[in-house]
């Protein structure tokens, strides 16, 4: 059987994930580590696996991920989007299912920049009336 690769890129905050799906048994590696050791929190792992669970393809594909930037939650979000896009490349009929679950939408929220004259993005110095 010929090995077929499906690629997807996901971003969240400053994290960038490059995902490669190959036909296999459901093995998931992130930066050459097992995904359970890379993402210790079960909620983060579940969030990352959502596209595979919803499409019922968890044991059909092996997932290889290269991710950098951001924290673990942002990386999990980036991986989730990358997996969803790669699944869409392999099975275009999944689009309505993934779209309904909101897995194809890039979360555009990121840190607001600090403005001059303020202590943080919106926190102003204490005001004194007298």
From Swiss-Prot:
Gene3D superfamilies: 3.30.230.10
UniProt key word Ribonucleoprotein: yes
Pfam families listed in its UniProt record: Ribosomal_S9
Entry similarity comment: Belongs to the universal ribosomal protein uS9 family.
GO terms for biological process, alphabetical: translation
Protein name as annotated: Small ribosomal subunit protein uS9
GO MF terms, alphabetically ordered: RNA binding; structural constituent of ribosome
Species for this entry: Phytoplasma australiense
UniProt KW Cell membrane keyword: no
PROSITE patterns: RIBOSOMAL_S9
GO cellular component: cytosolic small ribosomal subunit
Keywords from the named record: Ribonucleoprotein, Ribosomal protein
Domain of life (superkingdom): Bacteria
């Amino acid at each position: 059987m010929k090995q077929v690769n499906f690629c997807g890129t996901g971003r969240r905050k400053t994290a960038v994930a490059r995902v490669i799906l190959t036909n296999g048994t459901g093995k998931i590696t992130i930066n050459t580590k097992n995904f359970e050791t890379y993402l210790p929190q079960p909620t983060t792992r579940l969030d990352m696996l959502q596209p595979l669970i919803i499409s019922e393809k968890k044991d059909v594909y092996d997932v290889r991920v290269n991710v950098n930037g951001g924290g673990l939650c942002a990386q999990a979000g980036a991986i989730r989007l990358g997996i969803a896009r790669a699944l869409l490349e392999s099975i275009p009929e999944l689009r309505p299912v993934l779209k309904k679950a909101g897995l194809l939408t890039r979360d555009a929220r990121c840190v607001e920049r600090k403005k001059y004259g303020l202590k943080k993005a919106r926190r102003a110095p204490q005001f004194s009336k007298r």
